[in-house]
Amino acid sequence: MYIGQAKVKLFHDLSCKKELKKDISGKYFIDVRVISGQPTHTLTKRIYAKNLGTHKAYNVNLVGSNQNVFMQKKELKSNEISYIDISVEIPKGDKGIRTILTKLEYTQLP
């Protein structure tokens, strides 16, 4: 628990036990396995955000290139969990593991 602040982190599952991998700049890596046979294929990955702090987090958003983001909530209370759906377009014939790079942004003031 982070006392006196909001602290939002991204997780693989609803139980929020395993945090997504981060690089040194604070961007999250989301690895997904892809096989695309259609001309274009939309891949949707669901991840979860949890506020581990004691204060409310406002304007929670994911920033990245070539991705559409749907967020269940834009504000997270203390210990609240919300899902985030990330959609990316996959070209035909793309196989293997695809990495989505995204950055989590939020504010502690409304």
PLM segments and residue spans:
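Terminal connector regions
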Residues: 3-6, 92-110
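Beta-sheet-dominated interaction scaffolds and their linkers
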Residues: 5-52, 73
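Intrinsically disordered, low-complexity Pro/Gly/Ser/Thr-rich segments with frequent PxxP/GP/PP motifs
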Residues: 68-95
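Short acidic, flexible loop segments centered on an aromatic residue
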Residues: 52-68, 103-106
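Short, solvent-exposed loop/turn segments enriched in Ser/Thr/Gly
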Residues: 39-46, 82-84, 94-102
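Solvent-exposed strand-loop boundary residues in beta-sheet-rich modules
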Residues: 14, 66, 108-110
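A cross-taxa feature marking solvent-exposed loop/turn segments within ectodomains of secreted
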Residues: 3, 42, 55-57, 69, ...
